[in-house]
């Protein structure tokens, strides 16, 4: 048995996903979100056993969204405004508390195991949920506050190729090889499918 634990986490990026009138998506370029301290993943699944002839006969399963929870350094005010679905005044460099109108995004990050193997995880479409900001006075201790946000993923319409076929999928992940990071998760780069081909791009 080769015992492993998760140890290492970095490079949280996000890219805007635009949904057209026909429901088809296009992806923008990767942008830096914040320094990443912790990431948790919880699939929203449910199941129920159905009984026939006085015994449990079948199990019905259902799958909902997948929820990611991130603890990060404090993003820029503009980034916080964007993901919260508020309005950014670029002239005044000011966040406006307008009515919330959240956009879809893709997110990606790199995590590692204790042997140094790194993996990239690309979540293709979702919306940022609740964010948590807590402010505190400066005192004579090392007290500080981080930033917390959730991301609820859904399955995009685009079919992503794999194993000679294709399927709709919410995310993909794999161990990084030489040169992979520059292709799959690079600031200013395209959001790509499993093969490394760019997904439909926003003009």
Predicted segments, located by residue:
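Oligomerization/assembly interface segments of phage tail-like spikes and tubes
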Residues: 56-81, 143-156
């Amino acid at each position: 048995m080769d015992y492993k634990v998760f140890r290492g986490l970095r490079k949280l990026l996000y890219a805007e996903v635009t949904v057209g009138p026909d429901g088809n998506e296009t992806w923008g370029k990767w942008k830096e979100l914040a320094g990443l301290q912790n990431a948790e993943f919880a699939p929203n699944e449910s199941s129920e056993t159905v009984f026939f002839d006085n015994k449990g006969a079948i199990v019905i399963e259902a799958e909902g969204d997948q929820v990611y929870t991130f603890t990060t350094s404090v993003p820029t005010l503009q980034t916080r405004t964007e993901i919260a679905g508020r309005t950014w005044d670029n002239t005044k460099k000011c966040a406006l508390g307008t009515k919330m109108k959240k956009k879809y995004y893709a997110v990606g990050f790199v995590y590692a195991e204790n042997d140094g193997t790194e993996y990239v995880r690309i979540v293709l479409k979702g919306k940022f949920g609740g964010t948590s900001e807590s402010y505190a006075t400066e005192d004579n201790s090392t007290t500080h506050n981080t930033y917390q946000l959730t991301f609820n993923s859904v399955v995009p319409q685009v079919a992503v190729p794999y194993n000679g076929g294709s399927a709709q999928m919410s995310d993909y992940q794999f161990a990084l090889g030489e040169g992979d990071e520059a292709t799959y998760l690079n600031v200013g780069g395209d959001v790509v499918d499993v093969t490394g081909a760019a997904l439909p791009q926003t003009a």
